[in-house]
From Swiss-Prot:
Gene for this chain: PGLS
EC primary class: hydrolase
Protein's UniProt name: 6-phosphogluconolactonase
Keywords for the protein's UniProt record, in alphabetical order: Acetylation, Cytoplasm, Hydrolase, Phosphoprotein
Documented EC number(s): 3.1.1.31
GO molecular function, one term: 6-phosphogluconolactonase activity
Length: 258
């Protein structure tokens, strides 16, 4: 069994400082990936509070790179709710409105689900699109995945004690019984999450403190979904604000612009 990915925990004094640093890291990762002619940068996005955080910080951070650089980005989604893109619960819809409208990124650069399909077919269709975008990879290898973590320890649409945690064959799985609405979703599976070159978890607020202590410090017999993300050949980073990190006793790096 491969050794767990090296883990870096960074703690910021506020969500605003965290967001600014996250945006800079995305841009730096992109620049490293695009240093070779003909290369591209592949980014997997999650929803929730990450949408507003990236919408606030990423356009300005990415502006110096220019449209030619951003034209070499490919975006996908770590999970998605099976609702129309115009629906308030659509992760892609929210990013399209609040972030992508501010960036010179074309629809052809964004890999989305087809929300008109039944959930099983939507998962198969999204998997097919990913395989087309990541030709040559038996499992899609994203340069960077940005993940959130729920107060129950879920990440993407992988929930505690759910059978999808055992999925090893599919790269995308349907879920029809999500404990968090809406119930029908499409999610990347653990093999894809663990194939990424870099994974960044983002968590803010005191409401995440207890679950983060379990994920980052406890050795549980039945690990929470977020604790199962251990990139086999990549980096694992945690970006937390002080409120979310308040119960941690493990070493972490403290960041502040004050």
């Amino acid at each position: 069994m491969a050794a767990p990915a090296p883990r870096l925990i960074s703690v910021f004094s506020s969500p605003q400082e965290l967001g600014a640093s996250l945006a800079q890291l995305v841009v730096q990762q992109a620049a490293c990936c695009l240093a070779d002619a003909g290369a591209r940068f592949t980014l997997g996005l999650s929803g929730g509070s990450l949408v507003s955080m990236l919408a606030r910080e990423l356009p300005a951070a990415a502006a110096p790179a220019g449209p030619a650089s951003l034209a070499r980005w490919t975006l996908g989604f770590c999970d998605e709710r099976l609702v129309p893109f115009e629906h308030a619960e659509s992760t892609y819809g929210l990013y399209r409105t609040h972030l992508l409208s501010k960036l010179p990124i074309f629809d052809s650069q964004v890999i989305t689900i087809n929300p008109a399909l039944p959930v099983e077919e939507a998962a198969e269709d999204y998997a097919k699109k990913l395989r087309q975008a990541f030709q040559g990879d038996s499992i899609p290898v994203f340069d960077l995945l940005i993940l959130g973590v729920g107060p129950d320890g879920h990440t993407c649409s992988l929930f505690p004690d759910h059978p999808l945690l055992q999925e090893r064959e599919k790269i995308v799985a349907p879920i029809s019984d999500s404990p968090k609405p809406p119930p029908q979703r499409v999610t990347l599976t653990l093999p894809v999450l663990n194939a990424a070159r870099t994974v960044i978890y983002v968590a803010t607020g005191e409401g995440k403190a207890a679950i983060l202590k379990r994920i980052l410090e406890d050795k549980e017999e039945n690990p929470l979904p977020a604790a199962l993300v251990q990139p086999s050949a990549g980096k694992l980073c945690w970006f937390l604000d002080e409120a979310a990190a308040r119960l941690l006793t493990v070493p972490f790096e403290k960041h502040s612009t004050l």
